[in-house]
Structures are given as structure tokens and as C-alpha cells.
Design a protein with these regions (language model features):
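Transmembrane-helix signature of 12-pass secondary carriers
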Residues: 2-249
Length: 249
């Protein structure tokens, strides 16, 4: 396998996995603003916990459940772009919010990005990676979640003495990696498997050629056609047979 081609795939995988960095950062960054926000808005413990602090988690749940819809409809790459947009506006909106409801709405938006990223990023990486390297490359996403958590704690520590509006800086700083991530996503190719699933064969061939996998075109096409045929069913995640594992999850 050509080392230059493999290097390209590694770079594309790293770029897509940066969604995990934003996941980790977004999840933890609120911790630095926790007490400041409750004091600022004089919120009750129940309201502060379930709305101000908890709204991002509700967004994550919805994003994870429904994130597969845009990933399949508009593609993995376009979904990853929109995830970056969600994170960016969530950071700016949260930083500029002057009341808890507006703050919670923008945190919910960020949560949607978190949830959707758990679907789109691993799917994209697994679809561009050679089978033998798939596990290693998808692991970039998990690594970046942990890295994002670490950097968020460090960022909060460095901004803790930034005055009475330190919480705004803590929340707003996420806009920087969100913008960088979004711009980088524009440089990666679309998933060849998604292109084939939409019968965009010529585009898929070009991407596979750039990845040194053009010889696999027919095999991948047959595999996707088989999967599409097998997928014709009325079962959904909410079907009776999935109810127990869904509740446990």
C-alpha cells in the first residue's frame, strides 16, 4: 500500500476525528462556568442543573439518535461541516447570552453537534480506511475526545482570572477550534461508500483512485447494493426486539 496514499488517509482521518476534540471540549468547558452562572442568574439548584447545565446533554441525546439522518441524506462530509457550524454558533451564542434560557438554547445546539459527531466522524473514518487499519484510525476519534477534555480543563484554568466575565471567555474560546475544524473539513473528500450508496459512481471512482483503492470499486459497489437490499425492512431502533438494549443503553 503506497505510503503517500496511506499518509493522506491518516491526515483525512485525523481531520475528521477533530470532531471528537470538540466533543470533549464542549462537554467539559461548562464546568469552569458552573458556579459563576448560578450566582449570576440566581438560579435554583433544580433549574440550574436540569436547564443551564443539563441542556447540552439533552442535545447530545437528540444528536446521537437522529444524527444518522443527515449523515445518510447529505453525506458524512457535509454533516461534519454542519457539526462544526453548530459548535461555532453554540460557543459564540453561549458566550454572549444574557439570560439562562438563551444560554441553554445555545448549549442545546452544541449538544446536537456532540451527538451527531458520534455518528458521522467514526462512520466517515471507517469508510475511507483500509480494512487492516480501520480500528487504529477510528481510535483517533476516541483519542481526540480525551484530548479535548484535557485542553478544556487547561483553558478554564488559564481563563479563571479573566475578570467577572471569565465564564464568557471560557465558553467563547471554543469558537476558535470549531472554526479551524470546519475549514479543515472542506479539504477532505466525500466518503466513497456514501457516494456509491447514492449511485454517484464516477465521483466515487475518483475518490477511490485518490486512495489507491480503485481496484476495489466493483467489490464495494456489490457490498453496498447487498446492504441496501438487506436494509429494506420495517424495523427501526424503536422496534420491540430492540427495546431492551435501547433502554439499557
Amino acid at each position: 500500500f503506497n505510503i503517500l496514499i496511506m499518509n493522506k488517509i491518516v491526515v483525512w482521518s485525523l481531520i475528521a476525528s477533530l470532531a471528537g476534540f470538540l466533543f470533549g471540549f464542549d462537554t467539559v468547558v461548562i464546568s469552569g462556568a458552573d458556579k459563576k452562572l448560578q450566582e449570576l442568574w440566581n438560579s435554583s439548584d433544580a433549574f440550574h442543573g436540569t436547564v443551564v447545565m443539563g441542556m447540552a446533554l439533552w442535545g447530545t441525546v437528540f444528536g446521537a439518535i437522529f444524527g444518522g439522518i443527515p449523515a445518510n441524506k447529505i453525506g458524512r462530509k457535509n454533516t461534519l461541516i454542519w457539526i462544526g457550524v453548530l459548535f461555532f454558533f453554540s460557543a459564540i451564542g453561549s458566550a454572549l447570552a444574557n439570560d439562562p434560557i438563551v444560554f441553554a438554547i445555545f448549549r442545546f445546539v452544541g449538544g446536537l453537534g456532540v451527538g451527531a459527531s458520534t455518528i458521522a466522524a467514526p462512520a466517515y473514518i471507517s469508510e475511507i480506511a483500509p480494512a487492516k487499519d480501520r480500528g487504529k484510525l477510528v481510535a483517533f476519534y476516541q483519542f481526540n475526545i480525551v484530548l479535548g477534555i484535557l485542553i478544556a480543563f487547561l483553558s478554564n484554568y488559564l481563563l479563571r482570572n479573566a475578570g467577572e466575565n471569565s465564564w464568557r471567555w471560557m465558553m467563547g474560546v471554543q469558537a476558535i477550534p470549531s472554526l479551524i475544524y470546519t475549514l479543515f473539513i472542506f479539504t477532505i473528500p466525500k466518503s466513497p461508500r456514501w457516494l456509491l450508496s447514492k449511485s454517484r459512481n464516477e465521483e466515487a471512482k475518483k475518490v477511490l483512485a485518490s486512495m489507491g483503492q480503485l481496484a476495489d470499486f466493483e467489490a464495494i459497489k456489490r457490498e453496498i447494493e447487498h446492504d441496501n437490499t438487506s436494509a429494506v425492512t420495517n424495523d427501526t431502533i424503536f422496534s420491540k426486539k430492540y427495546r431492551t438494549p435501547l433502554l439499557l443503553a
